[in-house]
Every structure is written in C-alpha cells, then in structure tokens.
Amino acid sequence: MNSVADTAIFFGKFLYYFLESLVFKVIPKRKKDVSGEIVLITGAGSGLGRLLAIHFASHGATLVLWDINQEGNMETCRLVKQKGDVKVFAYKCDCSSRIEVYRVADQVKEEVGDVTILINNAGVVTGKSFLNTPDHLVEKSFLVNAISHFWTCKAFLPAMVKANHGHLVCISSIAGLVGINGLSDYSSSKFAAFGFAESLFLELTMIMKTKVKSTIVCPYFIKTGMFEGCTTKYPLLLPLLEQEYVAQKIFNAILEEQVYLIIPKFAYVALFLKQIISPKMMIALGEYLGVDTCMTSFTGRVKAEELQMETKRKEQ
C-alpha cells in the first residue's frame, strides 16, 4: 500500500513541477531583491568577477571582493564605487590556500558580517596537454577551480544554514560537463566543481534548508584573458562568448534563483548528443567544429605570480 501511495505522490509532484516549469518558460520568475545582501565574489580582480561585482553594486548589494591580484581587485573596487554609495570591501586572498581562505573569511565576518551570496568564480587555466602539464600546475588547477569551493562553503555556509537564507553560486564550465582536448586538468577540476555544487544543492534540499539557493553555471569559453588565443574552426558558428553577455545571464539566473545555467543554449544539444550517439560520432563533430583543436593557438593570461613561481621551481 505504501508503494502505491508513494508512486501516486511521485507522479503528482512530477506533473506539478512539469507544469510549473512550463509556466515559467512563458512567464518569467519574479526576481529577488539583492539590496543589502553581502555578496562575496572570488576572482573579482578582472573579467567575469569584475562584471558581476558591478551588476550587484548597481542593485544595492554590499560587495566583498577577493582576488590574489591586489592591483586588479582595487581597480574593480574603484569601478564599483562609481555606481554610487556602495559598500565595498577588497581583500587579497589566495583561494588555493585553505589556511588563507579561512583567515580572510574570519576577517570578513568580523569587518563586514555574514556573507549571504557566495560566488565561487576564481579560476585558472593551464592549457597544456596532460603529458606536458607539470604536477604543480595540475594541483593548482584543482586547488583553485574546485577545492577552494569546499573551503569557502565551509567558511560561509553554516551562517546561511542557521538563518535559512543565502545563495551559493558555482561558476563551472561547459568543460565541466564534456571533456575537451588540451584541458585535462581544467576540465576535470570543473567536473569536480559541478559535482560538489550539485551534491551540496541536494544536501540542502534534504535538510529542508530550501531558502539557501544554489546556482550552477556552465558557460562555453568566454572572451577573457584566461582563454586568450582559443578559437574554433568556425567562429561565426561557435564563437567565444562576450563577457558582458555571460555576466548578465548569470546575474539574471541568480535573481531568478535558477539552479542550472548552461550558456549558450546550443550546448544543451551537444550534451544530449553525447548521450545518444557513439564516441566516434562525437569526435567527428568535434573535428568539424574545431573544438578538438581549439586549444592549439591558446596563449592564456600569464600572471606575474605564476612567472615567479615557475622561476623559483627552475632554480631549485
């Protein structure tokens, strides 16, 4: 009897949520108010992190900016302040260091308050084939792109759970859903970030903390210094995404409390095809679009800190 009741309840919920999703396809969700929210953005010193900071500043949020690049972070701080009377706090933080994340997190709690929207955006790209990637760069990719999410969530999630109010945002990648040639360390670290964020979303649902929202973002390559030189065979068919376009999409997804955001929508087709066609057909599609060779001309953004690290290692 219980199985019959459970089945009836399941189909009832399934039908309700299906109809609800159809309604929201036609009628946009009501966007939440983020004024007064304390928003922490990692990797805020440039690119997507900077643009997201500007969006939140325009809507009255208090900004907490983290980046290892202090100069870039202060420039973001300056741009944010141009939006008017905005509370903004900038901190230098190496997100690959658990000790430093916890230390700076304690400083934020003391000086600003409990973070209510956490955006794990910091990321690094090596852009080398697996056999040509030094061990320390593999570790760096995982520490920044995935493991740092564990430390930031450990630091700020307890207060959200206690208040049953908050929002976790994971900036993963389309490379966190589909493996890409030349991005073995980056892709696997983004798979890890996606898996962690999705598991955490389910954990929060199971403990009935439904007011702590999750948004998991998987964009195609963005036109930033991080993917400098990256291109496909037919840029008009599969172009790199503009930063402002992606930032606006992410900001809207947060305001609408959307759980999954994959950009562009063409990527949904690729994910569907991955499930139904043979690996050889997927490889043929990648060759046609030039995705398999997109990293061949990659140059990337080489930071001073990375150059210094490389020099020190060679001297040892």
Swiss-Prot record:
**Residues annotated as signal peptide:** none
EC number(s) recorded for this UniProt protein: 1.1.1.-
Query: Which UniProt key words apply to this protein?
Result: NAD, NADP, Oxidoreductase
State the name under which the record lists this protein: Short-chain dehydrogenase/reductase family 16C member 6
Sites binding NAD(+) sit at 40-64
Instruction: Name the species this protein comes from.
Output: Mus musculus (Mouse)
Gene that specifies this protein: Sdr16c6
Q: CDD domains in the record, alphabetically?
A: 17beta-HSDXI-like_SDR_c
Annotated residues that bind substrate are located at 173
Give the main EC class.
oxidoreductase
What disulfide bonds does the UniProt entry report for this chain?
none
MF-aspect GO terms: oxidoreductase activity
Family, according to the entry, reads as follows:
Belongs to the short-chain dehydrogenases/reductases (SDR) family.
Active-site residues, Swiss-Prot/TrEMBL? 186 (proton acceptor)
User: Coiled-coil annotation: which residues?
Assistant: none
Superkingdom is Eukaryota
